[in-house]
A protein has these predicted regions:
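Sec/Tat signal peptide C-region and signal peptidase I cleavage site
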Residues: 15-19
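Solvent-exposed, acidic/flexible segments
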Residues: 37-44, 127-136, 151, 166-170, ...
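Surface-exposed aromatic
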Residues: 30-31, 106-107, 112-115, 154-167
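Fold-level signature of zinc-dependent metallopeptidase catalytic domains
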Residues: 21-45
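Catalytic Zn2+-binding segment of zinc metalloproteases
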Residues: 142-157
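Post-HExxH zinc-binding segment in Zn-dependent metallohydrolases
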Residues: 159-182
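Sec-dependent N-terminal signal peptides
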Residues: 4-13
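Metzincin-family zinc-dependent endopeptidase catalytic domain
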Residues: 42-138
Length: 182
Protein backbone atom coordinates (compact mmCIF):
# COMPACT_ATOMS: atom_id res chain seq x y z
CA UNK A 1 0.00 0.00 0.00
CA UNK A 2 2.86 2.38 0.83
CA UNK A 3 4.39 1.76 -2.59
CA UNK A 4 1.12 2.52 -4.34
CA UNK A 5 0.67 5.76 -2.38
CA UNK A 6 4.29 6.74 -3.02
CA UNK A 7 3.91 6.14 -6.77
CA UNK A 8 0.62 8.05 -6.76
CA UNK A 9 2.14 11.09 -5.00
CA UNK A 10 5.15 11.08 -7.31
CA UNK A 11 2.80 11.01 -10.31
CA UNK A 12 0.67 13.88 -8.97
CA UNK A 13 3.78 15.91 -8.07
CA UNK A 14 5.26 15.37 -11.55
CA UNK A 15 1.97 16.37 -13.15
CA UNK A 16 1.85 19.66 -11.24
CA UNK A 17 5.54 20.39 -11.87
CA UNK A 18 5.08 19.82 -15.60
CA UNK A 19 2.06 22.14 -15.69
CA UNK A 20 3.96 24.84 -13.82
CA UNK A 21 6.92 24.59 -16.22
CA UNK A 22 4.77 24.61 -19.34
CA UNK A 23 1.85 27.02 -19.03
CA UNK A 24 -0.49 26.98 -22.01
CA UNK A 25 -4.12 27.45 -22.91
CA UNK A 26 -5.97 24.32 -21.87
CA UNK A 27 -9.42 25.11 -23.27
CA UNK A 28 -10.15 25.35 -26.98
CA UNK A 29 -11.26 27.45 -28.67
CA UNK A 30 -9.45 30.40 -27.15
CA UNK A 31 -11.84 33.36 -27.02
CA UNK A 32 -10.40 36.55 -28.54
CA UNK A 33 -11.76 40.08 -28.38
CA UNK A 34 -10.59 42.42 -31.15
CA UNK A 35 -12.20 45.88 -30.95
CA UNK A 36 -13.46 47.58 -34.08
CA UNK A 37 -10.59 49.66 -35.42
CA UNK A 38 -10.98 49.64 -39.19
CA UNK A 39 -8.41 47.69 -41.17
CA UNK A 40 -6.36 47.06 -38.02
CA UNK A 41 -9.13 44.81 -36.67
CA UNK A 42 -9.24 42.86 -39.92
CA UNK A 43 -5.47 42.35 -39.91
CA UNK A 44 -5.41 41.29 -36.24
CA UNK A 45 -8.11 38.68 -36.84
CA UNK A 46 -6.16 37.47 -39.88
CA UNK A 47 -3.07 37.07 -37.68
CA UNK A 48 -4.89 34.82 -35.21
CA UNK A 49 -6.53 32.91 -38.07
CA UNK A 50 -3.09 32.37 -39.65
CA UNK A 51 -1.90 30.64 -36.46
CA UNK A 52 -5.01 28.45 -36.42
CA UNK A 53 -4.69 27.53 -40.11
CA UNK A 54 -0.93 26.91 -40.15
CA UNK A 55 -1.15 24.80 -36.97
CA UNK A 56 -3.98 22.73 -38.47
CA UNK A 57 -6.18 23.84 -35.58
CA UNK A 58 -3.78 22.83 -32.81
CA UNK A 59 -4.81 26.23 -31.48
CA UNK A 60 -8.31 27.43 -32.32
CA UNK A 61 -9.83 30.85 -31.83
CA UNK A 62 -13.33 32.22 -31.58
CA UNK A 63 -13.83 35.97 -31.85
CA UNK A 64 -16.20 37.43 -29.27
CA UNK A 65 -17.91 40.81 -29.02
CA UNK A 66 -17.00 41.64 -25.42
CA UNK A 67 -13.66 41.75 -23.60
CA UNK A 68 -15.31 40.26 -20.52
CA UNK A 69 -15.99 37.06 -22.51
CA UNK A 70 -12.44 36.81 -23.87
CA UNK A 71 -9.28 34.97 -22.90
CA UNK A 72 -7.22 37.23 -25.15
CA UNK A 73 -8.04 40.95 -25.25
CA UNK A 74 -6.55 43.11 -28.01
CA UNK A 75 -6.19 46.87 -27.63
CA UNK A 76 -5.17 49.35 -30.32
CA UNK A 77 -3.32 52.49 -29.23
CA UNK A 78 -1.39 55.15 -31.09
CA UNK A 79 1.89 54.17 -29.41
CA UNK A 80 2.74 51.34 -27.04
CA UNK A 81 4.19 52.75 -23.85
CA UNK A 82 6.96 50.97 -22.08
CA UNK A 83 6.82 47.22 -22.66
CA UNK A 84 9.19 45.42 -20.31
CA UNK A 85 11.62 48.37 -20.55
CA UNK A 86 11.56 48.33 -24.35
CA UNK A 87 9.91 50.76 -26.73
CA UNK A 88 7.86 48.42 -28.89
CA UNK A 89 5.20 48.40 -31.58
CA UNK A 90 3.38 45.56 -29.82
CA UNK A 91 3.27 44.14 -26.31
CA UNK A 92 1.63 41.07 -24.78
CA UNK A 93 1.08 40.44 -21.09
CA UNK A 94 0.02 37.02 -19.79
CA UNK A 95 -1.84 36.05 -16.63
CA UNK A 96 -1.74 32.53 -15.26
CA UNK A 97 -4.00 30.74 -12.84
CA UNK A 98 -3.23 27.28 -11.52
CA UNK A 99 -0.11 27.12 -13.68
CA UNK A 100 -2.02 27.67 -16.94
CA UNK A 101 -2.83 30.73 -19.01
CA UNK A 102 -5.94 32.53 -17.89
CA UNK A 103 -5.89 35.91 -19.65
CA UNK A 104 -3.73 37.66 -22.20
CA UNK A 105 -3.61 41.35 -23.10
CA UNK A 106 -2.22 42.33 -26.50
CA UNK A 107 -1.48 45.99 -27.22
CA UNK A 108 -0.74 47.10 -30.79
CA UNK A 109 0.68 50.54 -31.64
CA UNK A 110 -0.99 51.75 -34.82
CA UNK A 111 0.91 54.97 -35.51
CA UNK A 112 4.42 55.86 -36.58
CA UNK A 113 6.39 58.99 -37.23
CA UNK A 114 7.84 59.28 -40.71
CA UNK A 115 10.39 61.88 -41.74
CA UNK A 116 10.01 63.60 -45.08
CA UNK A 117 11.62 66.62 -46.62
CA UNK A 118 9.53 69.62 -47.47
CA UNK A 119 10.98 72.87 -48.74
CA UNK A 120 14.51 71.74 -47.92
CA UNK A 121 13.77 70.89 -44.29
CA UNK A 122 12.94 67.70 -42.45
CA UNK A 123 9.33 67.36 -41.31
CA UNK A 124 8.09 64.68 -38.92
CA UNK A 125 4.70 63.35 -39.97
CA UNK A 126 2.40 61.12 -37.92
CA UNK A 127 0.66 58.39 -39.90
CA UNK A 128 -1.11 55.09 -39.46
CA UNK A 129 1.17 52.10 -39.96
CA UNK A 130 0.71 50.31 -43.25
CA UNK A 131 -0.02 46.59 -43.46
CA UNK A 132 3.66 46.00 -44.24
CA UNK A 133 4.64 47.80 -41.03
CA UNK A 134 2.12 46.14 -38.71
CA UNK A 135 1.03 42.65 -39.85
CA UNK A 136 4.31 40.96 -38.84
CA UNK A 137 4.00 42.57 -35.41
CA UNK A 138 0.43 41.26 -35.12
CA UNK A 139 1.54 37.71 -36.02
CA UNK A 140 4.36 38.02 -33.47
CA UNK A 141 2.09 39.28 -30.67
CA UNK A 142 -0.54 36.61 -31.45
CA UNK A 143 2.29 34.10 -30.98
CA UNK A 144 3.06 35.58 -27.57
CA UNK A 145 -0.67 35.50 -26.72
CA UNK A 146 -0.71 31.73 -27.25
CA UNK A 147 2.34 31.38 -25.03
CA UNK A 148 5.35 31.44 -27.32
CA UNK A 149 8.52 33.26 -26.37
CA UNK A 150 11.14 34.73 -28.66
CA UNK A 151 13.02 32.52 -31.10
CA UNK A 152 16.72 32.73 -31.90
CA UNK A 153 15.96 31.66 -35.48
CA UNK A 154 15.99 34.80 -37.65
CA UNK A 155 13.39 33.43 -40.08
CA UNK A 156 10.80 32.88 -37.34
CA UNK A 157 7.97 35.35 -36.74
CA UNK A 158 8.91 34.97 -33.06
CA UNK A 159 12.38 36.41 -33.73
CA UNK A 160 12.13 39.83 -32.07
CA UNK A 161 13.58 41.92 -34.91
CA UNK A 162 12.87 42.66 -38.57
CA UNK A 163 9.15 41.98 -38.31
CA UNK A 164 8.52 44.30 -41.23
CA UNK A 165 9.99 41.76 -43.66
CA UNK A 166 8.27 38.82 -41.93
CA UNK A 167 4.65 38.60 -43.04
CA UNK A 168 4.06 34.86 -42.61
CA UNK A 169 4.47 31.94 -40.21
CA UNK A 170 7.28 29.44 -40.75
CA UNK A 171 7.98 25.80 -39.95
CA UNK A 172 10.10 27.05 -37.03
CA UNK A 173 7.06 28.82 -35.60
CA UNK A 174 5.08 25.58 -35.85
CA UNK A 175 7.93 23.67 -34.18
CA UNK A 176 7.78 26.10 -31.25
CA UNK A 177 4.00 25.78 -31.08
CA UNK A 178 4.00 21.97 -31.21
CA UNK A 179 6.69 21.87 -28.52
CA UNK A 180 4.47 24.05 -26.32
CA UNK A 181 1.21 22.15 -26.90
CA UNK A 182 2.38 18.53 -27.18
Amino acid sequence: MKKILTVFFIFVFALFCTAAEKPRWTGQPIYVYVPEYGNMSVLMKQAFTAWQTKSRSLVRFKFVSSPSNANIVVEFVDFVGNCYDVNAVGCTEMETRGGQYYKSYVTIGTKEYVRRYEGGRSVRELRTRSKEHIYGVMLHEAGHAIGLGHSEYAKSIMFPYDLESMQYLTDEDMRLLYKKYH
